[in-house]
Amino acid sequence: MQRVPSRRAFLGAACVACGGAHLGFHATPVQAQQPPAPPAAAGAAAAARRRDWFPSRWGPQDEIGAANLLTPQKVLEAIRLAREGKTYRLGIVVDRNTPAFPPRSVAVTVMMPDQFGGAVVGESENRMSYCDDMVTGWFGVGTQIDGLAHLGIDGVFYNGNKAQDFVRTTGVTRLGIEKIPPFVTRAVLVDLARFRNRPRLDGGELVTADELRAAMQQQNVRVTPGDVVVLHTGWLSLIEQDPRRFGSEEPGIDAAGAEYLASLQPLAVGADTWGVEAVPFKNPKVIWQGHQVLLAQNGIYILENLDTRELVRDGVTEFLFVLGQPLYRGAVQGIINPVAIR
């Protein structure tokens, strides 16, 4: 993979394209029944003033949001979708050159402790050797899940949790990744590139709520509560070809599109882009509002950098989705490798 220029240069390029998006949620270090869906918010700014999006419909103590929709019945229904036994890896390979939202990066260091110059461990008669490894980096690199503590509105996160009450440098004390149950559910894929009759949408290209609805109707995609909705834009094809461009802009949805998807009561919304939303933002002073709608207001998880290419090549629009989250206590996001099965 082509190496991305220095993190400082990459940050500058991304910030120009994103209209100052880096000033959003990463600027500071502290950072079985289905009830009816809550009314859509009129906008994140108004919601921040009204505070009418909490407590959660699952109660004031809830920490898992839309994961409450993962009932045993839902899981059993989803398992029936695995008819051929074919699996698809939806995660991408991550290394120190993977483009990521600035200033994120990740690096793997491999070592052979106390084995310099061909020495073996403890002078063992069977000459045992081993390698160990260490990861240094951020959890928001590559294919990732955004947990409910990842992004909020004016310091308030899902279910009214205030940052000063639960965000610690050692990890969040509520809404952590470790609280999320395994995802075993139905997923649907909406091919937005095919809807636009192009192999790939452009950076900053907005897919409106009406277009989402039309694409789903065209492709006979129906979302049921607890599903994972996956959006294919073709953007991931740039990650090797042009990593700088890939990481500095992207096609996607906006707040209105997020509100439409939230009205369908999915478990999660994902895409083959690094942020799901269209970047640069139409208004550089209104940033990541779709994240606010999904995560903070509705408790719906976000999945980024999903590798949808093989699914699209095979014409798959409905499949079993399986994901076991990394159990890092107090983390707000995590590098993942979901599996699609049909």
Which residues does each predicted region cover?
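A generic secondary-structure boundary signal that marks alpha-helix termini
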Residues: 19-20, 61
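Signal peptide processing junction and immediate N-terminal pro/mature segment
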Residues: 23-35
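Active-/binding-site microenvironments in catalytic and ligand-binding cores
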Residues: 34-342
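N-terminal secretory signal peptides and thylakoid transit peptides that target proteins
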Residues: 1-19, 28
